[in-house]
């Protein structure tokens, strides 16, 4: 499976330059998981293939890549401490662990926001993307806001 973005693009889009994260710390598997779990259900295989083939560069650059990068960071974040050689959980105080858990929750919220942003853009411009079917987008049927499940 060819990915829409590279590990370096994930780092450039979602990490601040001063971090210790390098391209080798974000794996192709992290990106593939993010695309399979969070992108494909929203855009579908046909639009994914079109974007991978180089079509719809504005959609890819402005909406898809930031969303995939955010989900990739969310997926990779718990593993980054290990990959960067930072001490394991038992070496942290409970407060440090709570801060790390809060950071992961923030990453999830940010990724969800970018997913919704991309979905809203696709819905508003669905005539421009022949491969996109809004009826297949799960965000058009169900969402969880503040712990409340909304089904439409």
Describe these PLM feature segments.
Residues 90-107:
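Short His/Asp/Glu-rich catalytic/ion-coordination signatures at enzyme active sites or charged loops
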Residues 1-65, 79, 83-87, 91-95, ...:
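Conserved short "hinge" loops at termini or chain/domain junctions
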Residues 109-111:
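Long, hydrophobic, well-ordered secondary-structure blocks that form the structural core
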